[in-house]
Amino acid sequence: MDSHTVSSFQDILMRMSKMQLGSSSGDLNGMITQFESLKLYRDSLGEAVMRMGDLHSLQHRNGKWREQLGQKFEEIRWLIEEVRHKLKTTENSFEQITFMQALQLLFEVEQEIRTFSFQLI
């Protein structure tokens, strides 16, 4: 896993946790939770790829890992749409920068997960 991506996740999560978006704070908390879940999933896939022959362990631990992979891509798409919506509706420059960085990070993580999953297939 790229150390830049780790710091990006931490930075974006920290920035998002400081935002006050009024009535949509529940939505923001949901986004933060999804980001954290996505980071953990991406990390576990990356670790599985790093260990040779770990595909069997991954399949044994989670027989439906391909289904789970599909669900994670759905979560990424949902997060991308949510971040795009927040980006369009906010006028605060701090929030705009944060959401632009979050969007970029989501695209990077989606690509990393695709790469990891192709290596495991």
Swiss-Prot record:
GO terms for biological process: exit of virus from host cell nucleus through nuclear pore. Keywords: Host nucleus, Host-virus interaction, Transport, Virion. The keyword Transport applies. InterPro entries: Flu_NS2. The keyword Transport applies. Interacts with protein M1. May interact with host nucleoporin RAB/HRB and exportin XPO1/CRM1. This is Nuclear export protein. It comes from Influenza A virus (strain A/China:Nanchang/11/1996 H1N1). The lineage of its organism: Viruses, Riboviria, Orthornavirae, Negarnaviricota, Polyploviricotina.
